[in-house]
């Protein structure tokens, strides 16, 4: 049974109709692993690292996604994400610096509920980017 994966954001297409053996997404209630023949569903996605294995490959590919939707149908999996970053697009040092500055700022300032919610989103996205970048093999 074949399963195709498409990942799109408002700015770019990461994958379009690529055959995959497995997809794992950060769903609303935890990690969701999707294999060929999975029951149809639509779910919201949280910020985190999604993974997939292209058909016949051993290595998992990954991307950091920030909020979106996942649709599973008999034809495959469609990911509509607000943001999707591939590991090679991530500046690990800049992300770590951003995270440190954000954490320092949040500890030293009074903030509104809205600012707190924004901090939580940004923090989760930065942590996921660091996780993805650190999982990627070093480039030669």
Curated annotation (Swiss-Prot):
GO terms for cellular component: plasma membrane; proton-transporting ATP synthase complex. Pfam families: ATP-synt_DE_N. The keyword Chloroplast does not apply. InterPro entries: ATP_synth_F1_dsu/esu, ATP_synth_F1_dsu/esu_N, ATPsynth_dsu/esu_N. It is a peripheral membrane protein. Keywords: ATP synthesis, Cell inner membrane, Cell membrane, CF(1), Hydrogen ion transport, Ion transport, Membrane, Transport. It comes from the Bacteria. One of its GO terms (molecular function) is proton-transporting ATP synthase activity, rotational mechanism. Signal peptide: none annotated. It is found in: Cell inner membrane. The keyword Flavoprotein does not apply. NCBIfam families: ATP_synt_epsi. Belongs to the ATPase epsilon chain family. F-type ATPases have 2 components, CF(1) - the catalytic core - and CF(0) - the membrane proton channel. CF(1) has five subunits: alpha(3), beta(3), gamma(1), delta(1), epsilon(1). CF(0) has three main subunits: a, b and c. HAMAP family: ATP_synth_epsil_bac. Produces ATP from ADP in the presence of a proton gradient across the membrane. This is ATP synthase epsilon chain. It comes from Bdellovibrio bacteriovorus (strain ATCC 15356 / DSM 50701 / NCIMB 9529 / HD100).
